[in-house]
Amino acid sequence: MKLFILAVGHKMPGWIASGFDEYAKRMPPELRIELREIKPELRSGGRSAESVMAAERQKIDAALPKGARIVALDERGRDWTTMQLAQALPGWQQDGRDVAFVIGGADGLDPELKARADLLLRISSMTLPHGMVRVLLAEQLYRAWSITQNHPYHRA
């Protein structure tokens, strides 16, 4: 099984890439994290947020690994603790399907994609920069894995 983070947005600051890479490289070979950046749609010419999200959904769909479990990050998603994420990981691994975490663009995720998702998950009740979400998600995935392995990284 592989973990994918599909993120609408590109040209992130260097510290975002460094932070993401730090946690991604810590993951074990059997649970690698791959980042797939989706170029955002331009909001020009009077385009509505709905049309922008629909166009971004098409790009996300093209980048989704076939048969992957879709975890859409959304402010109205379920509010999991790190322990709940750690409890989900072994089941996902046994299932054998790749897991794709999807981070939307400035307008969020298209409702059709959210309706298809296996899980709607909220990273925080606070509004966060999209680049920061990549780093936080990678760290939480590493922390969840470390919990499943009784690794000393997580000290609760």
Swiss-Prot record:
Keywords: Cytoplasm, Methyltransferase, rRNA processing, S-adenosyl-L-methionine, Transferase. Transmembrane segments: none annotated. InterPro entries: Alpha/beta_knot_MTases (IPR029028), RlmH-like (IPR003742), tRNA_m1G_MTases_N (IPR029026). It comes from the Bacteria. S-adenosyl-L-methionine binds at L73, G104, I123, S124, S125, M126, T127, L128. Disulfide bonds: none annotated. It catalyses: pseudouridine(1915) in 23S rRNA + S-adenosyl-L-methionine = N(3)-methylpseudouridine(1915) in 23S rRNA + S-adenosyl-L-homocysteine + H(+). GO terms for molecular function: rRNA (pseudouridine-N3-)-methyltransferase activity. Its EC number is 2.1.1.177. GO terms for cellular component: cytoplasm. It is found in: Cytoplasm. NCBIfam families: PRK00103.1-4, tRNA_RlmH_YbeA. Belongs to the RNA methyltransferase RlmH family. Specifically methylates the pseudouridine at position 1915 (m3Psi1915) in 23S rRNA. Homodimer. PANTHER family: METHYLTRANSFERASE (PTHR33603), RIBOSOMAL RNA LARGE SUBUNIT METHYLTRANSFERASE H (PTHR33603:SF1). This is Ribosomal RNA large subunit methyltransferase H. It comes from Burkholderia multivorans (strain ATCC 17616 / 249). The gene is rlmH.
